[in-house]
């Protein structure tokens, strides 16, 4: 038995260039934790959650994270809080995969 939910969730995710694959790590009535694996030149398009806070945890690679028009190229490990209503997204401009989780709470 392992307490780690991350390794098993992303083990089989291997997106092609330009593609994003996802896995739900935790889903409860209150919170969603979802893994995003970005292939080279892939993106999670900017979007917002009006009623929820979304926290990105960069776990692998070097994605560029966008929040409210500001962007930063990050290297794992990194954490980016996205408050309610913040327009946020991520893209991978490298030749390797990038992995981040998004923790969203409260759920609508």
Regions found by a protein language model. Name each.
Residues 34-49:
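Conserved short histidine dyad/triad with adjacent acidic residue
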Residues 49-50, 94:
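Short glycine/proline-enriched turns and hinge-like loops at secondary-structure junctions
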Residues 51-68:
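Glycine- and acidic-residue-biased ligand/ion/polar-headgroup-sensing regions
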Residues 84-108:
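Ligand-binding loop in jelly-roll beta-barrel domains
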